[in-house]
Amino acid sequence: MTNEIRLGEYNLLRVKEVARREGFGEIFGLYMDGGREGEILMPQKYVPEGAKPGDEIMCFVYLDQEERPIATTEKPLAKVGDFAYLECSWVNEYGAFLNWGLTKDLFCPFREQKKRMEIGDHYVVYVHIDEESYRIVASAKVERFLKDDAAKAGLKRNQEVDILIWQKTDLGFKAIVNNQYPGLIYQNQIYKYVHTGDRMKAYVSNVRPDGKLDLTLQPIGMAAAEDFSAVLLQYLKNNNGYCVLGDKSSPEDIKHQFQVSKKVFKKALGDLYKNCLVRIAEDGIYLNAET
C-alpha cells in the first residue's frame, strides 16, 4: 500500500471502514486509508462487490466537485503525466471541460488552449497538476511538456516505439513518442491512413541533434521486407494463390492495397521469388503449387 497519495494516478489503498450516513446507518461508500491525506471516500457506486475493511483496492484518486480527494475504480482515458486525445464536452467563462472517462470532466483553462476549444471537437492534451491550484488540468500546449533528450534515453535507429499522432504539418505528421518525445513522420513515409489522435507502432529512422526523432511506420530496410514477406505470402494463400499487383505496378496501387512503399513491396516479392515460393508473371504474382 502506498504511503503518499498520487493525485491523478492509480493508488493501492486499504479499506479503513464502511462509510455510513450519521443517524441513518445508510452505507454510502468506503473510507480508504489515505495516509497523511486522511480518509478518502470511495462512493458506493464504485465499490467492488464484497469489498470490506482491510482489503486493498487499486483505485484512481482525483478531486470531486468540491475539490476533495475521491477514490474510484473507474478507468480514466489518461492519468497525470499522459498525453491523450480527448473530446470537449462543454465550455464556460473559465475554460473547457474534456471527457476523460470519469464522472467529473477534466478542466482545460483558456490559458492552456492554443485556440478556443469547441464542444464536440477533439484535442491532443497533456494531463498535469496545476502548481497554483493543485487541480488536475489539461494543456493543449503540449510542446512545453515534451523532452528533448531522446538520444540520452538511448533510442536508436529502427527501434520500435509507441506513438500518438499529434498534428498535421506541411512536412507530414508530428507525433508524441513513448509518451515523452517529439517526433515527425514525413509525408513520403506514410503508406496508410493516419489521423490526429491515432495511436500506433512506429520506428525511429533518425535521432536528430536537437533531440527530436524522425519516424517511419515500417521497419527500415530488410526488416521491413521480411515483415511484409509474411503478409504478402498470407495474402496469396487467402486469395487463391494470386495477386494482380507485381513489380511493375504503380506505387499508388501498392500503397492502396497493402499500405507499404513500392520499395518494400519489391524487396519482399524478391525474397519470396528467391525462395521459390512465388512465380512472377505479366498479369501478377502466382503462389507456387507446392507452397
Predicted regions and their residues:
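Single-stranded RNA-binding regions, centering on S1/OB-family and related RNA-binding modules
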Residues: M1-T291
